[in-house]
């Protein structure tokens, strides 16, 4: 994984449906990341599906600032291990709400962590970047429309 830190979050989509899950990094031990796995309330994951997801490379980075909110509404499944060689797409997107209330989107390089583009409004080009069909986009847009803030 690229530049992973404790507390970082990832989401996954199950079988191209509207079922989502959440993975949080707990620690790194040797060549393995210890993670907590949560599922969205409407998700239905079996142990086999969980193992399949954890051993795949379909993880997407989610901005850390709303981790507590996601976990609050997720159902805790258990702790698991994933290999540290799991990789991510080169370019990812994240976003944050500024102190003045403005929403800003970032495109960043997952290898270097450098922001390569900043947008003041959601642009169609962002749809092609991960996380695409994850909580990262629709969930956060909805929450911001409801007045969600960092505090």
Question: What residue spans do the PLM features occupy?
Answer:
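Short coil-to-beta transition motif at edge beta-strands of beta-rich domains
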Residues: 2-14
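Short beta-strand-centered aromatic/proline hotspots
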Residues: 19-28
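Basic/aromatic-rich interaction segments and small domains that mediate binding to polyanionic partners
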Residues: 28-50
